[in-house]
Amino acid sequence: MQEYKELIKECAKELEGLMPEISQKLVNIAKINSPDRAFLEYLKVVEQVSLMKTERKQKNKALIILWRYGEALEKELYSDVKFFAKPLHKRIFRFVDWKIIGMLFLVFIILPAITSNLWSFRSEHYVLYLNENVDFPRELCNYRTSWLYDFRTSMVCVLKYGYGSINVTLRGNSWEKGVEAQRFISDMEYDFDRVKSPITYIQTPKETLRYKKGVCSDFALLVANILLDNNVSPVYIVHTVVRKEPSGGHAAAGIYVNGTLWILDWGSKPTKFQEYLENIDRIWEIREVRIYRITRDRITLERIYKARLEDDRWRFLYSVIIMLGIFILKRREWWIM
């Protein structure tokens, strides 16, 4: 029954150059006369090595040696093998597993959601004060195709030179007229089919009134036309340019009341400019907001709010995170370290 001592001594000798302190412990265990106690102490050594913080290859090699001799030791001492003779499951090579999928979800869904909330047009923009005169040759306004698809040119031909303008009488002060004009356009239908079209043309106020429907640019021109015709001057048109929007963005008319710019947009109540920006910012990624000041004889691009574009270096960071994450998750499976 002394064979178990010889097995432990052989294990100690094999570990002598790899882990001297563990080898010495095994030498001491080999002196124990009780087989059960010796086996129990051997198991404690295996556990100690598995929990050691040391170089991975060294630890793995030591565990392989301990496991091999432990299996032989258990067979020698007990007929019922249960500690070392468990079948090892074959490692299956998988390039993609749930850990990889979870990491990709974190990198491409969670992180962009967080960073998009951190970036906001309201906090990341600057203002250019231009007071730039906006004009277009009057004789060219006779040719509809010259301004049919350009909103800025359409403002000149419709609001300055009166092409396709209408006469609608409003009552009250400037605020009441603005509210009534906003209510007037909100009773019309929004032409979503035109929004989906790859090429969006501009309607005159007369056409919008005739069809009883339009898009944001049509309603902005209509409101500005009605208010100017009712001696509310100046009026403003706010043109918001957004990223990846086929129609080019959003337009709405506005008026100043008591020093505050109020936006008169289709389908909503009169809204303060800052609140309007917040609402747009939640829906689209704003690139710039152009403020046009309009009177009967002059249209001026008064100012532009321009976004400070986010840094694209995050794309490189994402790539590094992905490669590093795959390396960490799969290093054992690929036997990298």
UniProtKB/Swiss-Prot annotation:
Pfam families: DUF553 (PF04473)
Gene Ontology CC: membrane
InterPro entries: Transglutaminase-like_domain
Gene3D superfamilies xref list: 3.10.620.30
Main location: membrane
Subcellular location: Membrane
Membrane topology: Single-pass membrane protein
Alphabetical keyword list: Membrane, Transmembrane, Transmembrane helix
Tagged with keyword Transmembrane: yes
TM region(s), chain numbering: 100-120
Superkingdom in the source lineage: Archaea
Family: Belongs to the UPF0252 family.
Designated name of the protein: UPF0252 protein PH1321
Taxonomic source organism: Pyrococcus horikoshii (strain ATCC 700860 / DSM 12428 / JCM 9974 / NBRC 100139 / OT-3)
